[in-house]
């Protein structure tokens, strides 16, 4: 539940940023967020995401 909620909030933030950024910058933001989500596994970071253990 928390993971889906985090993803929804993240998507809202991206949509809000799109209006301020040009498309290239928006894609860089998305790529950076994807990379940070991969690293955020098994522990909580300041980004607020929490995953339980590695598979």
Curated annotation (Swiss-Prot):
<dbReference type="GO" id="GO:0031640">
    <property type="term" value="P:killing of cells of another organism"/>
</dbReference>
<dbReference type="GO" id="GO:0005102">
    <property type="term" value="F:signaling receptor binding"/>
</dbReference>
<dbReference type="InterPro" id="IPR012519">
    <property type="entry name" value="Lantibiotic_typ-A_Pep5"/>
</dbReference>
<feature type="cross-link" description="Lanthionine (Ser-Cys); by the dehydratase ElxB and the cyclase ElxC">
    <location>
        <begin position="36"/>
        <end position="40"/>
    </location>
</feature>
<comment type="function">
    <text>Lanthionine-containing peptide antibiotic (lantibiotic) active on Gram-positive bacteria such as staphylococci, enterococci and streptococci. The bactericidal activity of lantibiotics is based on depolarization of energized bacterial cytoplasmic membranes, initiated by the formation of aqueous transmembrane pores.</text>
</comment>
<dbReference type="GO" id="GO:0042742">
    <property type="term" value="P:defense response to bacterium"/>
</dbReference>
<keyword id="KW-0208">D-amino acid</keyword>
<keyword id="KW-0044">Antibiotic</keyword>
<feature type="cross-link" description="Beta-methyllanthionine (Thr-Cys); by the dehydratase ElxB and the cyclase ElxC">
    <location>
        <begin position="44"/>
        <end position="47"/>
    </location>
</feature>
<feature type="propeptide" description="Cleaved by ElxP">
    <location>
        <begin position="1"/>
        <end position="24"/>
    </location>
</feature>
<feature type="cross-link" description="Beta-methyllanthionine (Thr-Cys); by the dehydratase ElxB and the cyclase ElxC">
    <location>
        <begin position="46"/>
        <end position="49"/>
    </location>
</feature>
<feature type="modified residue" description="2,3-didehydrobutyrine; by the dehydratase ElxB">
    <location>
        <position position="52"/>
    </location>
</feature>
<keyword id="KW-0929">Antimicrobial</keyword>
<feature type="modified residue" description="2,3-didehydroalanine (Ser); by the dehydratase ElxB">
    <location>
        <position position="27"/>
    </location>
</feature>
<protein>
    <recommendedName>
        <fullName>Lantibiotic epilancin 15X</fullName>
    </recommendedName>
</protein>
<feature type="modified residue" description="2,3-didehydrobutyrine; by the dehydratase ElxB">
    <location>
        <position position="31"/>
    </location>
</feature>
<comment type="similarity">
    <text>Belongs to the type A lantibiotic family.</text>
</comment>
<feature type="modified residue" description="2,3-didehydrobutyrine; by the dehydratase ElxB">
    <location>
        <position position="32"/>
    </location>
</feature>
<keyword id="KW-0425">Lantibiotic</keyword>
<feature type="modified residue" description="D-lactate; by the dehydratase ElxB and the dehydrogenase ElxO">
    <location>
        <position position="25"/>
    </location>
</feature>
<keyword id="KW-0883">Thioether bond</keyword>
<dbReference type="Pfam" id="PF08130">
    <property type="entry name" value="Antimicrobial18"/>
</dbReference>
<keyword id="KW-0078">Bacteriocin</keyword>
């Amino acid at each position: 539940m928390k993971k889906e909620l985090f993803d929804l909030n993240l998507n809202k933030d991206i949509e809000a940023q799109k209006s301020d950024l040009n498309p290239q910058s928006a894609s860089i933001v998305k790529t950076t967020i994807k990379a940070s989500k991969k690293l955020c596994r098994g522990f909580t970071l300041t980004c607020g995401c929490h995953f339980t253990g590695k598979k």
